[in-house]
Amino acid sequence: MKVRASVKKICSDCKVYKRNGVVRVSCKVKKHKQRQG
């Protein structure tokens, strides 16, 4: 999980979604997992 100020899709499989007001990126490539914070 990377914590970043700016979350972006890294590849076409990445999905951006919001959970409890926190923007997150989920992907089948575990390296691409991100959270805004």
UniProtKB/Swiss-Prot annotation:
Query: Any keyword Calcium?
Result: no
Q: Does the keyword Ribosomal protein apply?
A: yes
Alphabetical UniProt keywords: Ribonucleoprotein, Ribosomal protein
Q: Which GO terms describe its biological process?
A: translation
Residues passing through the membrane, by range = none
User: Which Pfam families does the UniProt entry name for this protein?
Assistant: Ribosomal_L36
Q: Name one GO cellular component term.
A: ribonucleoprotein complex
Q: Which domain of life is it from?
A: Bacteria
Family, according to the entry, reads as follows: Belongs to the bacterial ribosomal protein bL36 family.
Q: Which PANTHER family match?
A: 50S RIBOSOMAL PROTEIN L36, CHLOROPLASTIC, LARGE RIBOSOMAL SUBUNIT PROTEIN BL36C
Official protein name in the record: Large ribosomal subunit protein bL36
Instruction: Provide the taxonomic classification.
Output: Bacteria, Pseudomonadati, Thermodesulfobacteriota, Desulfobulbia, Desulfobulbales
Q: Which gene encodes it?
A: rpmJ
